[in-house]
Curated annotation (Swiss-Prot):
The active site is at 83 (nucleophile), 173, 175. InterPro entries: Class_I_gatase-like, GATASE, GMP_synth_C, GMP_synth_GATase, GMP_synthase, GMPS_ATP_PPase_dom, NAD/GMP_synthase, Rossmann-like_a/b/a_fold. GO terms for cellular component: cytosol. It is an enzyme of class 6 (ligase). Keywords: ATP-binding, Glutamine amidotransferase, GMP biosynthesis, Ligase, Nucleotide-binding, Purine biosynthesis. One of its GO terms (molecular function) is GMP synthase activity. This is GMP synthase [glutamine-hydrolyzing]. Catalyzes the synthesis of GMP from XMP. ATP binds at residues 227-233. PROSITE patterns: GATASE_TYPE_1 (PS51273), GMPS_ATP_PPASE (PS51553).
Length: 516
């Protein structure tokens, strides 16, 4: 099968870079993000049909501005330069000029179209278009051969066009939802200017990937760590379709799962696929190692280390295994190559990252090109049930990081019952599919309450529900107060050990989605 047309996005550290990639893919065109440090020769070798330069927080005049090879402009490829990318264009090409702006623009701005350009074809004929700005510097003079295509109140040059070279630039962000007609502008660039074909679908991805997996594995065998989440389950089903009984799945029940979670996924896989499924009950081992531990980082490290130890023992029983399959997604890959470099570690990530080296296994990552929403589309293509496809993300350390303080069997049981009510009410009210994630947290404090004629002194539970696209940023969900009232009433009446419920109204940033 032929490879789909590819758009290369060069990342200069913008918070919106992944959003650009998502918007391009939503239009049916495959996109890849690469650091801005790639050379023109490397770009050409990747054979993209078009290039997009992202925005970024730097100034082109800074001594430590992101490195960039201006020869990229001479490759003859259609290019769209966004925000910092536009300033870069004016900085490097003859005739262009960039200066620091005294009037910084952040947020909504009114765009006036000045030139008839294919980039703005089909936009409504009106005086102003709302666009989203986020910049300090601005272009003072257009490079030779470029026409000024738009302006705003504070910026005389808000868009540039060179039709013969098929290079266009925007000072605003067409990828964000706040920009009116941003989708149309990107569509014009991809299909009218670059002439790309809309061939990136999850069915085409699946067809190509299954053939690739079959060829790569050959007669060898693969071990896959199942977590119960959608990513690892999709990986398992894909591999089973590609290599059948040469796949071995290991499900380690660490005792930190949601109510019925392990049994539910294991039952589905056993019922619908003739899988080699090894179910390991290691709950007591994990709880023993977590006894007395209250520090969240320590909890994560203990759980990660113990998982590797248990997985190693089980995988050693499978001597023919040569590959380890993981549910790595594209945002994980991007983070490792981003121009921003190693970010400050906010929390250690629990995954099986240490296993390939420890066990000397080659790695298979069938989903490493996909975003989370695309993984769900693959799951639909595979005919998987809704309860797996739409399951909310769940952290590797499980309920251990939703119990603030020490993890005990008693506290786990309280949290499981509380969380089950939150989940069931989200489903019953029709909100489960509307939000990114919803769950309960058990706090390390008790408060006084009254039940019947008696005084109580019980635990406090928090409800956390957020909206997000990719978990990189999130806002708290505006659940109707009626739903919160039902949740709270049920929790206090049905869960022994909780007498107070609070609702978390923090966004990410500054808070994180999980409490630990």
């Amino acid at each position: 099968m032929s490879q789909p047309d590819k758009v290369l996005i060069l990342d200069f550290g913008s918070q919106y870079t992944q959003l650009i990639a998502r918007r391009v893919r939503e239009a049916g065109v495959y996109s890849e993000i690469h650091p801005c440090t790639v050379t023109a020769k490397e770009v050409a070798a990747m054979a993209p049909k078009a290039v997009i330069l992202s925005g970024g927080p730097s100034s082109v005049a800074d001594a430590d501005a992101p490195p960039f090879d201006p020869a990229v402009f001479d490759l003859g490829l259609p290019m769209l330069c966004i925000c910092y990318g536009m300033q870069l264009l004016a900085h490097h090409l003859p005739g262009g000029q960039v200066a620091a702006s005294t009037d910084r623009e952040y947020g909504r701005a009114d765009l006036q179209l000045l030139a008839d350009t294919p980039l703005f074809a089909g936009l409504p004929q009106k005086d102003g278009h709302i666009v989203w700005m986020s910049h300090g510097d601005k272009v003072m003079a257009a490079p030779d051969g470029f026409v000024v295509a738009a302006r705003t109140k504070n910026v005389d040059i808000a868009a540039l066009a060179n039709a013969s070279r098929r290079i266009y630039a925007l000072q605003f962000h067409p990828e964000v939802a706040h920009t009116e007609d941003g989708e149309r502008i990107l569509h014009n660039f991809l299909f009218e200017i670059a002439g790309l074909t809309s061939g990136w679908t999850m069915s085409s991805f699946l067809e190509t990937e299954l053939a690739s997996l079959k060829e790569k594995v050959g007669d060898d065998e693969v071990v896959c760590a199942l977590s119960g989440g959608v990513d690892s389950t999709v990986v398992a089903v894909m591999l089973h379709k590609a290599i059948g009984k040469k796949l071995h799945c290991i499900f380690v029940d660490n005792g930190l799962l949601r109510m019925g979670e392990g049994e539910e996924v294991a039952a589905y896989l056993r019922e619908h696929f003739d899988l080699n499924l090894h179910y390991v009950d290691a709950a007591k081992l994990f709880l023993d190692k977590l006894a007395g531990v209250t520090d969240p980082e320590e909890k994560r490290k203990i759980i990660g280390k113990t998982f590797i130890e248990v997985f190693e023992v089980e995988a050693a029983k499978l001597p023919k295994v040569k590959y380890l399959a993981q549910g790595t997604l594209y945002p994980d890959v991007i983070e490792s190559v981003s121009f921003k470099g190693p970010s400050a570690v906010i929390k250690s990530h629990h995954n099986v990252g240490g296993l390939p080296e420890v066990m000397k296994l080659a790695l298979i990552e069938p989903l490493r090109e996909l975003f989370k929403d695309e993984v769900r589309k693959v799951a639909v293509e595979l005919g998987m049930p809704d309860f797996i496809i739409w399951r909310h993300p769940f952290p590797g350390p499980g309920l251990a990081i939703r119990i603030i303080g020490e993890v005990t069997e008693e506290r786990l049981e309280i949290l499981r019952r509380t969380d089950k009510i939150v989940q069931s009410e989200l489903v019953a009210s029709g909100w489960y599919r509307k939000v990114w994630q919803g769950f309960a947290v058990l706090l390390p404090l008790k408060t006084v309450g009254v039940m019947g004629d008696g005084r109580t002194y019980e635990n406090v539970a928090a409800i956390r529900v957020v909206d997000s696209l990719d978990a990189m940023t999130a806002d708290w969900s505006r659940l109707p107060s009626e739903i919160l009232a039902v949740m709270s009433n049920r929790i206090i009446n049905e869960v022994k050990g909780v007498n107070r419920v609070v609702f978390d109204v923090s966004s990410k940033p500054p808070a994180t989605i999980e409490w630990e």
